[in-house]
């Protein structure tokens, strides 16, 4: 009994220390024009993620003359239920991603086009890591943007694991800036994108495949407004937020969590879309 109580006390003390660290990070958060960088690489699990997360910040980098490169790991085909339609959806989403990159003024995106429903396979993961290593070597970023590794979407978490594998062998000194749709620690950087929101909204409309599934533009607006209300300065009506870590800390943190395990991929997973019945 005493041993169990001691273990529980240690676990509670560790939890309190972690919450204290989070509070200190929150109090130290900085409202910045954009996270410091001279070269930027943004990694998207799906086409549209680089707009939804850091799209307004990308616009600010472009306006400042800072090169922004983007890559997308999967083809996003699994947003439709019918397998017979998935190849067509993949092509459509690739065209949308290129159109949005042109609209934002960022570089031509690198589309790995790995079938979304195959990324859980080890061979596909190895392929993604190799492609990520090439993208990192080509872009030579000092700021790397990815989804938060405990994001509620399992594929976002898996892509973070693959990014960490690619970074593990890199000696590059860079800062990893994570964004999230759901779970998130207190942000390191808050970026006021009030002025950029209209253009981000217009870019979101170019993802017509997503707008047909849900009110995608409203989702973009809501996330920006929520972040402004929760973390932004009083004058901001739209913000993007980022949790920043040095490369080595990010790699150690992510690779310690087994995010590529079947259990992790199943945790919080969205229901798998059923095959539409034959007619």
Would you name each region that the model predicts?
Residues 186-232:
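A conserved mid-domain beta-alpha-beta active-site/ligand-binding segment of alpha/beta enzyme cores
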Residues 226-253:
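Glycine-rich phosphate/pyrophosphate-binding loop and the adjoining helix
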Residues 116-120, 184-185, 251:
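A short acidic, often aromatic-flanked loop/helix-cap motif at beta-alpha or helix-coil junctions
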Residues 1-174, 178-179, 198, 205, ...:
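Active-site beta-strand->loop->alpha-helix modules in alpha/beta enzyme cores, enriched
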């Amino acid at each position: 009994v005493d041993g169990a109580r001691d273990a529980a006390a240690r676990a509670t003390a560790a939890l309190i220390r972690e919450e204290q660290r989070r509070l200190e990070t929150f109090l130290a958060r900085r409202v910045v024009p954009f996270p410091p960088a001279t070269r930027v690489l943004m990694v998207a699990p799906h086409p549209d993620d680089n707009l939804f997360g850091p799209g307004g910040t990308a616009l600010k980098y472009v306006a400042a003359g800072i090169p922004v490169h983007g890559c997308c790991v999967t083809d996003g085909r699994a947003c439709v239920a019918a397998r017979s339609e998935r190849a067509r959806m993949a092509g459509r989403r690739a065209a949308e991603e290129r159109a949005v990159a042109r609209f934002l003024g960022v570089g031509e995106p690198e589309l790995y086009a790995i079938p979304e429903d195959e990324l859980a396979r080890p061979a596909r993961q190895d392929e993604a890591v190799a492609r990520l290593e090439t993208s990192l070597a080509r872009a030579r970023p000092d700021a790397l943007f990815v989804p938060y590794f405990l994001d509620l979407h399992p594929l976002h978490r898996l892509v973070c694991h693959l990014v960490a594998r690619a970074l593990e062998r890199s000696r590059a000194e860079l800062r990893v800036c994570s964004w999230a749709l759901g779970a998130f620690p207190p942000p390191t950087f808050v970026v006021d994108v009030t002025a950029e929101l209209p253009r981000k909204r217009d870019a979101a409309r170019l993802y017509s495949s997503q707008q047909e599934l849900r009110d995608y533009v409203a989702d973009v607006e809501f996330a920006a407004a929520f972040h402004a209300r929760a973390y932004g300065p009083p004058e901001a009506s739209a913000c993007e937020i980022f949790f920043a870590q040095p490369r080595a800390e990010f790699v150690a943190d992510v690779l310690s969590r087994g995010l590529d395990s079947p259990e992790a991929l199943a945790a919080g997973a969205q229901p798998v879309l059923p095959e539409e019945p034959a007619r």
